[in-house]
Amino acid sequence: MEQIITEFISRFGYAAIFILILLENVLPIVPSEIILTFAGLMSVKSHLSILTLFIIATIASFIGLLILYYICRLISEERLYRFIDRHGKWIKLKSKDLKRANDWFKKYGVWAVFICRFIPVLRVLITIPAGVNRMNVVTFTVISLIGTTIWNFGLILLGRTLSDSFGMLMTGLHTYSRIMYVVIIIAVIYFAIRYIGKRKRVK
């Protein structure tokens, strides 16, 4: 996957960034941490402008997240889970990941949308419960764009700054992703235990 993405960017430049980032905001199978850090690297070693990369990535993110948001507004939560159970394997999406994003959204609302924009996979999945639960589109868009703008600029700048250590950078990003998954799992277990404890006390 990584090699395909980097070769695609090397060959098609800005157009590749736009297509990949748009897809990344609709499907969680295209990792933006690879796309944008490599784009930052290419801004050093080619004619690509860091400002143009940032603008293109932000516009593509905006279009992609709104596409997914409006799709999810049209379907119920039950139908969504049934679809993921049947077809999720083709887009590397599991019901438990979606449930995690949904639980975060219902518990934290706007803050969940903002914070999840900095967490691989969940940064895409959080759009689904926002759409299904019909979160105000203006609020959703503003919060998402703030988080996405910070994420995009940070990764592009990181790739540009550490262009001489790209291999080490990719390893570090993979480690970050794994750590975030562990943190999320621990948080879910913690809140589940608290919820069960409260129900037992009520009984």
UniProtKB/Swiss-Prot annotation:
Disruption phenotype: Deletion of the gene does not affect sensitivity to the amphomycin derivative MX2401, which binds UndP in the outer leaflet of the cytoplasmic membrane and prevents its recycling. In another study, the deletion mutant exhibits moderate acid-dependent amphomycin sensitivity, but sensitivity to other antibiotics is unaltered at any pH. The double mutant uptA-popT is growth-impaired and exhibits cell size variability, and 10% of the cells have membrane permeability defects, consistent with impaired envelope assembly. The triple mutant lacking uptA, popT and SAOUHSC_00901 is not viable. InterPro entries: DedA_domain (IPR051311), VTT_dom (IPR032816). The chain crosses the membrane at residues 16-36, 48-68, 108-128, 137-157, 173-193. Signal peptide: none annotated. The keyword Signal does not apply. GO terms for cellular component: plasma membrane. This is Undecaprenyl phosphate transporter A. Keywords: Cell membrane, Cell wall biogenesis/degradation, Membrane, Transmembrane, Transmembrane helix, Transport. It holds the Pfam family VTT_dom. It is a multi-pass membrane protein. It comes from the Bacteria. The gene is uptA. Coiled coil: none annotated. Flippase that catalyzes the transport of undecaprenyl phosphate (UndP) across the cytoplasmic membrane, from the external side to the cytoplasmic side. Is involved in UndP recycling during peptidoglycan synthesis. It is found in: Cell membrane. GO terms for biological process: cell wall organization. Belongs to the DedA family. Its main location: membrane. It comes from Staphylococcus aureus (strain NCTC 8325 / PS 47).
